[in-house]
């Protein structure tokens, strides 16, 4: 009974350790931040990451993009959907990753800190927007994406949309512009994330701001295919304004992915699950075999040759 109690505690600890948490990324061209190395690009302390984000946003004349993607996991980056994001992460002088964060990033506090240091303009957008104003200096763009699906096919499509949307926004930057990119996530159905969602009044005000940014043009008439850029005339300045377009794809939802433990625990893959089952059978078998072998008793003269009978 005592051995079964110990086994239960060990299994419970393993399952708790494999429970999914939310990664947070920071990419920046801020010269004040130290250049990243293999040892300094990964952080395990949320406060260290938050301090680095505050320092990155404290520099004026910098374009900042904050993306909230609920349900994003570390193993999503092994699917090959983030080719543009990976390219930017390799090219950025400073990058920081908080792989396992159980706390949602407070973007409002980051924006408030940036406003205290610089005269910045803040734009809040929802994932349903089909047009985004371009990134520019002294502007913070906060995008709230829709929750990721648990179905593998639909999830892969959403991850590709996120990467393409990021590429479209990043393409609006000037070649010598300084920028910060923060990608935050939160577990699905997390009550703490409810405060980050844009309400109806704020979204309506942001929609009006987008129209003003486009110079009064109707973006619906100039809708582009996904992954393209549009250069639209700005009626206020008479110049060309680059606009990033984003369209939500419509994919059929198919349930051909992993379910159960494989979706709730990010490291609990089918391969590891089969390994655990094999160990559950092999280890007790080996233990019993060793006990049986050790219990075999052989007399001292068992292997002696029989004596010849004397006539």
Curated annotation (Swiss-Prot):
Subunit structure: V-ATPase is a heteromultimeric enzyme composed of a peripheral catalytic V1 complex (components A to H) attached to an integral membrane V0 proton pore complex (components: a, c, c', c'', d, e, f and VOA1).
Principal subcellular localisation of the protein: endoplasmic reticulum
Protein name (record): Protein big1
Bilayer disposition of the protein: Single-pass type I membrane protein
Record keyword Membrane present: yes
Ranges facing Lumenal side: 18-267
Similarity remark: Belongs to the BIG1 family.
Keywords: Cell wall biogenesis/degradation, Endoplasmic reticulum, Glycoprotein, Membrane, Signal, Transmembrane, Transmembrane helix, Vacuole
Signal peptide: 1-17
Subcellular location: Endoplasmic reticulum membrane; Vacuole membrane
Native organism: Schizosaccharomyces pombe (strain 972 / ATCC 24843) (Fission yeast)
